[in-house]
Swiss-Prot record:
Coiled coil: none annotated. The gene is hrcA. GO terms for molecular function: DNA binding. GO terms for biological process: negative regulation of DNA-templated transcription. This is Heat-inducible transcription repressor HrcA. Keywords: Repressor, Stress response, Transcription, Transcription regulation. Negative regulator of class I heat shock genes (grpE-dnaK-dnaJ and groELS operons). Prevents heat-shock induction of these operons. Belongs to the HrcA family. Transmembrane segments: none annotated.
Length: 344
């Protein structure tokens, strides 16, 4: 059982330690804690007994343990605060013209990695929730073509493929017609289901030779099922993570899955501190926060760093970036949905 004073002491030690990265002694706490040095030392000893503090090898001071950081995140972290002193710089960073969604997400990731010194990941709306709004096939050469998908009237995904040997020009038109008739307006999740259930029967009806046609469907749609992910500051992992964690970030789809699994459907923000699960990120801290992508859904910003982060400062910064990012995205999608020649 942690008393109110002990919690204040733990919070103050974490605040000092995350700024100085030096063990904290009782004298450093006396100005802020209205108690004698002896009382503070007793409380620090009790916090150590509970596993929330640990001794430093090189001094008589104490440092927060992993359990101490976990306790702080659960009981003391304020998720609603804003880094007001940094609002101007964050707004200024977004004061430029962007030509696609990925550029806006990349700017947010770059900004957060510069502020935090950590690795940052930004995720678009979950692929399964995106909707196919346009489709076309562009013939590139005698044997190659390009499938062009538009998701949510804003994101373009392309997939180059070899035209099957037995395909005629009219077969490509059939393929295009089937996709437009059966899939337009449906979510990616619905399309994935239809490819498994409806499409095999439709292929039998429309194609004389069905060899490789279902494989072609799966090939051209494969890219659409992948996460739209941007990263910044991967090199920072070398400062605080092991080689396995660094190499894990060479697999962006697995990184995206790990981040999504750490944030429940009903959560807007979450902080995981060395949660001990079987994961390459198990010994690290992951701060995840959802942000609104107008007209489409929500994306996720995630900061990956060492356990001894200044969590409150990072949450404040993430909150500001989220708000400015949402404003920028609102302008971006409002422009996309407007008549181009009426915009001044």
């Amino acid at each position: 059982m942690v008393t109110e004073r002990q919690q204040d002491i733990l919070n103050l030690i974490i605040d000092i330690f995350t700024k100085t990265h030096e063990p904290v002694g009782s004298k450093a706490l006396q100005e802020s804690i209205n108690s004698s040095s002896a009382t503070i030392r007793n409380d620090m000893a009790e916090l150590e007994k509970q596993g929330l503090l640990e001794k430093a090898h090189t001094s008589s001071g104490r440092m927060p343990s992993v359990a101490g950081f976990q306790y702080y995140v659960k009981h003391s972290l304020d998720f609603d605060r804003l880094a007001e002193n940094e609002v101007y710089e964050i707004v200024k960073a977004f004061d430029q013209e962007f030509f696609k969604l990925e550029d806006i997400l990349q700017e947010a990731a770059n900004l957060l990695t510069d502020l935090s010194g950590c690795t940052v990941v930004a995720l678009d709306v979950e692929p399964s929730r995106q909707r196919l709004t346009a489709f076309d096939i562009v013939v590139l050469g005698q044997h190659t073509a390009l499938a062009v998908f538009t998701l949510d009237e804003s994101r373009t995904v392309t997939s180059q493929f070899l035209i099957p040997r037995n395909f005629l020009q009219e077969d490509l038109l059939k393929l295009k017609s089937i996709i437009q008739e059966r899939f337009l307006g449906h979510t990616v999740l619905d399309i994935h289901y239809k490819i498994r259930t409806e499409i095999p029967q439709i292929i039998q009806r429309y194609f004389t030779t069905t060899d490789n046609v279902i494989d072609l469907f799966e090939h051209i749609f494969k890219e659409m099922f992948n996460e739209n992910i941007v990263m910044a500051g991967k090199v920072h992992l070398l400062n605080f993570a092991n080689l396995a964690a660094y190499q894990f970030f060479d697999q962006p789809q697995k990184v995206a899955l790990e981040i999504r699994e750490g944030l429940r459907e009903d959560q807007m923000q979450n902080v995981r501190v060395a949660d001990g699960q079987e994961s390459c990120l198990a010994d690290l801290a992951v701060i995840s926060s959802k942000f609104l992508i107008p007209y489409r859904g929500v994306g996720i910003l995630a900061i990956i760093g060492p356990v001894n982060l200044d969590y409150q400062q990072l949450i404040n910064q993430v909150n500001v970036v989220n708000r400015v990012l949402t404003m920028k995205l609102t302008d971006f999608y409002r422009y996309l949905s407007s008549n181009h020649y009426e915009v001044h």
